[in-house]
Every structure is written in structure tokens, then in C-alpha cells.
């Protein structure tokens, strides 16, 4: 049985759809390859996901003694968080509803040698 270590970021102020398109590209890749991909992608969510991947690698190194260079991204998923609701004043006393989505991002890594 492979030991997996995870890192979770909750209430991230971005839409789950925008995060999911990035997570689909790094799932199954090695740690080094995922970091390289995230550093060159032009999306805002890449910097957030890069921090989570680094945190998962650090968790694996500290808690299980794994080598960062031998880690693979085994599972990644994003869940919808609560939506922040705001109102924008409009003409004639109206207000338009502005929805600001949040999400919870989970990244799991495991040692390649196991």
C-alpha cells in the first residue's frame, strides 16, 4: 500500500472551474515536472497551486522522510466552497448581485519508489 501525503487549501478566492483545468494537467506528473509546468503557465491560479504542491512535498519530506525528487502527484481535486455575495449599486435604486466563488484545493503526493 502506497503512503500518500496531502496538502489542502481552503476558501481559495477563485472559481473551481479555473483551478480544475490546471489540476488536470499536473495530475500524475512528477514533483519536478509539476513545478516546472506551474511556473510557466499563464493562469493566476498557478501560483496558488504551486504553493499547495510545495506544501505537500514539504509535508512528505518532514512527516514520512520522502525525497522531493522522487515524489509524484497522485491525486488532485477541487471542491466548491461557499460563494461570497456582494451587491453593486445600479441606477434607480437597483442593485446587481455579484457572486465571488471560492474553492477548496487538495493535492496528494506519493513516493515513486513505493
Swiss-Prot record:
CC annotations in GO: cyanelle; large ribosomal subunit
Disulfides per UniProt: none
GO biological processes: translation
Matches recorded under SUPFAM superfamilies: Ribosomal protein L22
Annotated InterPro entries: Ribosomal_uL22, Ribosomal_uL22_bac/chlpt-type, Ribosomal_uL22_bac/org-type, Ribosomal_uL22_CS, Ribosomal_uL22_sf
Locations listed in the record: Plastid, Cyanelle
Domain of life: Eukaryota
Chief localization: plastid
UniProt-listed Pfam families: Ribosomal_L22
Spans through the membrane: none
GO molecular function, one term: rRNA binding
Zinc keyword on record: no
PROSITE patterns according to UniProt: RIBOSOMAL_L22 (PS00464)
Keywords: Cyanelle, Plastid, Ribonucleoprotein, Ribosomal protein, RNA-binding, rRNA-binding
PANTHER family: CHLOROPLAST 50S RIBOSOMAL PROTEIN L22-RELATED, LARGE RIBOSOMAL SUBUNIT PROTEIN UL22M
Subunit structure: Part of the 50S ribosomal subunit.
Known function: This protein binds specifically to 23S rRNA. The globular domain of the protein is located near the polypeptide exit tunnel on the outside of the subunit, while an extended beta-hairpin is found that lines the wall of the exit tunnel in the center of the 70S ribosome.
UniProt family annotation: Belongs to the universal ribosomal protein uL22 family.
Protein name as annotated: Large ribosomal subunit protein uL22c
